[in-house]
Amino acid sequence: MKPLMNDKRIDSTALAGQELLQLIKKTILTVGYVKEVNVIEEVIKECLSGSIVFLINGASGALVMIGGGGESRSVEVPPTDSVVRGPREGFTERIITNITLIRRKLKNPNFTLETLILGEQSKTTVCIAYLKGVVNPKLISEINRRLNRIQTDVILESGYIEQYIEDAPLSLFATVGNSEKPDIVAAKMLEGRAAILIDGTPFVLTVPALFIESFQSPEDYYIRPFYASLVRIIRFIAFMIGILAPAIYVAISSFHQELIPTPLLFTMATAEEGIPFPSVMEALLMGLIFEILREAGIRLPRPVGQAVSIVGALVIGEAAVSAGLIGSPMVIVVALTAIASFTLPAQTDSEAILRILFVLFAGTLGVYGIMLVFLALLVHLASLRSFGTPYLSPLAPFSLRDMKDTFVRAPFWAMIFRPRAISWHDPQKQEFRLSPEYVSEKSKKTRK
C-alpha cells in the first residue's frame, strides 16, 4: 500500500475509477501476477483462495493479486515410490507448486493446462495437464466429460475424483493411476497420458492406467537394464506368491498330499499334529492377524509402527506355534506371503482380497478351486478398460513392440516407440540407430 499512498499521480489525478484502476495496474503494482476481475463471484472465489483483491470506488472491476495463500509444506522426499537412484522431490498439497514441478521436467510449449472447479462447498481447483500433439484429443474430451458430471459438495483428495471417474468401480483393480513424484507423472505424459492435479493433495492422477504399471518402478529407468529386468521379474514372482502361496499350501495339505515329497510330508504332518484347526482356518486366521499388524504399523507413528509390526509378528507367531494353535509351516508361508506383498505397494489392497478368495476356494475345491479363481481373474482383467484402453495391454491385445517394457526393461535406445495402446499422433519418441555399438562403428568408419 505504501507506493499507492506516496504516488502523486493518484493524489492529483482527476481520473475516473476505472481509469485509475488501469493506472494502478500498469504502473504502480509490483506484484508478479495481477489480473482484472469483473464478476463478483470470481472476486469471492479469489478471496477464499487466499488472493489479495484491490477495489476502487467507482471502478466496475477489481484487481486480483496472487498471494501466498498461507503456510504450506515444502517440497520433500515422498514416502511412497522411494528410490535409491533418481529424483527425490515429491508433490505437495499446493497445486501451483505441483504444476511448477511438472513444468521443470517438461519445458515444452505444448504443455497444456485446463482448469475447472469441483465441489459445491469446497470449490476445489482441478487441473488437467497434458502435452498437445502427443495425447489423444478424445482422451481429454472423455476426462472433461467425466469430471463435469461430478456434482457433489466437497472434493478433499484425489481419491474422491478417482472413485467418480474410474471405469470399473466394483473391480478390485484401480483403472486410474496415481503418483506423488513429478518424474513419474512427466514420463507418463510423454507416453500420451493425461494428469489430473487436485488442490490440497500431493497425489496426482494419471489416465489411462494399465495393469503392467504396478510392476514398474521409476528406478527401473535410472539403473542398468539387466538388473532392472531382474528386479521386475522378481516383482511378478512376488505378486504370484502374495496371492497364491497360502492357497497352494491349503490345497496341497488338505486334498493333494500325494504331490508332497515323502520326507517333507512327514515333517509337515509332525508340525501339524495336535493343531485343532484345519489348514484353511489357519491360513485365514494368520492372514487376519497379519492385516491387523499391517494396519497398526501404518496408523501408529513411524518409529513405533515399525516396532509394533516386527515385534508383534514375532511374538504372536511364536506364541501361536508354542500354544499349538498354528502349525509352524503355516507361519512360514504367511511370513513369506507378507514379505512378497510388500514389493508391490500399488497392489496391496487387491492382493489381500484375492488372497482370501484363493484360500476359500482352495479349502473347498483344492487345486481346481485355485484354477477356477485364476481363470476368472484373467477373464476379469482382460475385460477391464481404462478410458478406452485395454487394461492388460500390451499383453492383451498382444503387442510385440511394447514387450520391451513389460516383464523386462530393454535399453533406452531399443525403446523407440511410445506404447501402441496409448500413443495417438506421434508414436515415435526417438530416432533409430541410437545404440552405442552403431555409434562406435560409425565413428570408426569416419576415422578411416
Regions found by a protein language model. Give the residues of each.
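Membrane-embedded alpha-helical signal segments
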Residues: M1-L244, I248, E258, T262, ...
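Generic detector of multi-pass transmembrane helix bundles and their immediately adjacent loops
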Residues: I248, P261-K448
